[in-house]
Amino acid sequence: EYCLQEAGCSLEDIDSIAINTQPTANYLKKIMHVLKYRVSISLIRDRFKNAIARKSLRDSLKECFPKQKFVGEIKNIEHHLAHLSSSFHVSPYEKATVVSVDGFGDFSSGCWGVGTGEKIEIEGRVYYPHSLGSFYQAITQFIGFPNYGDEYKVMGLAPYGKPAYLDKMKKIVLLKPDGTYSLDLRYFIFHKDKVSYEWDGGLPFVGRLFSDELINLLGPMRNSADKLSQFHMDIAASAQAMFEEALFHMLNTLYSRHGLDNLCLAGGCGNNSVANGKILSMTNFKNIYVAASAGDAGGAIGAAYSTYFEENKRNVKDTAMRHAYLGPEFDNVDISAILKKYIKELPSEDFSINLIDSVEDLSQKTAEALTKGKVVGWFQGRMEWGPRALGNRSILGDPRRSDMKEILNIKIKRRESFRPFAPSILREYVSEWFEQDDEVPFMMKVFPIKESQRSKIPAVTHVDGSGRLQTVCSETNPRYHSLIKAFHSMTGVPIVLNTSFNENEPIVYSPEQALNCFLRTKMDVLVLNDYFICRR
């Protein structure tokens, strides 16, 4: 509905709807898998239910748009082709090696080839059940993080450990001479038994993927309520090291084969920002593009572009995605109306509300609040596309304060202490603060912070001296750039701490959601466009 509204058209105007799955893909391999592994009846039944649900899209459209009629074509785009398109077709490259790695989709877990112009030629695949994504998810569960998407916790935990169990990980993930990999399936059950996907306390819970053989190999698994030990940290470090070794094994093979300097990476494993940050140093690729949404959500863009480029030429200048500010926006009129609605919750004796229509003045006032240790909710312009808050739906803090992580966790986040917060840095200063100099607009890479600078920004320096940075340019986000520039003028540090604007919920998208989060937590300041709201 939002996309139709933004485009100024109705459902009747749409020629095609593209979906990032093709149920008939690799059909013969699916049959052979069922016969080989004696797959449980419940798993087969679930797969058929999913296939039937996907075919009812026209019925879903009728329910959502009862007054409109869709007369166009529904196109199914193979899962990994959509992933590859979601990165290559929005990259600034005319030609690149393209790679997709994830859990699995349409019965494959890895896919690679070459993108040229609007065309993507797929050269090879790794087929289900052999999957780097499933390996990483299984180890995530083993460490005691059972929910879907918890892999980022393992990334955050890994620097606290050492890869002491890498030799055992190499018994689980087997590297092949052709650059691919396979799993020793003795350590898993997901390929033959039904794995439950359920909601538990508002969180998506995934059933166990691994067998008792994995416990026999590694040791006792952790229950989520148990305290994390050095053993778990070492397991996390070992899993991350194994993932990186397998990924770089594939990438180096592909570079040797094609000799192309450009790489486009996609798939859920493309969210492993630690590995992404090492690609330039561990391979011969010169340029890397990881899309703002590397996972399955990004497949929507990939499916759309795959369909579009079947009949249209590609102009890199028109399609290159240099920022992720594509979502809803609200003007001061909208915000004023909401503030009037909440007037009783914002009494003047407890809150001050000021309208500051100068970007420079607003930046100065916000930067000043940050220097005083205030926690600032920063709500500006269009919402970000993808999983990261990139300066339009962000909570900000002073990176110089060693206690800022604790302050944020006490006031708002209440998350695990080992998880790092991210630095947003002015693009022009990256080389002065980080060991690598690169554009990272979507916060998809982790770089080492220069040793001489680490003590200056303890709140965004992880235990291993790294930071998952976002580079900020005046061309793509002038208001956020102005704020960081003002903070730099006051402190000599061109960096602010940036975390997502939420409290154990999806990132806020509307002023009302932002205001509710502000009132519900102990946030000090809320900046809604030009409105500066401060607790007294």
Question: How would you name each of these model-derived features?
Answer:
Residues A237-L263:
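Phosphate/ATP-binding catalytic cores across multiple sugar-kinase/actin-like superfamilies
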Residues A7-S10, K30-L43, K49, R54, ...:
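Flexible beta->alpha loop and helix N-cap segments adjacent to enzyme active/binding sites
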Residues R222-A236, Q240-E245:
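Helix-hairpin-helix/helix-loop-helix acidic hairpins
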Residues E1-Y27:
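N-terminal cofactor/phosphate-binding cores enriched in small/glycine residues
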Residues L4, A237, N504:
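Short, flexible active-site loop motifs that bind/organize anionic cofactors or intermediates
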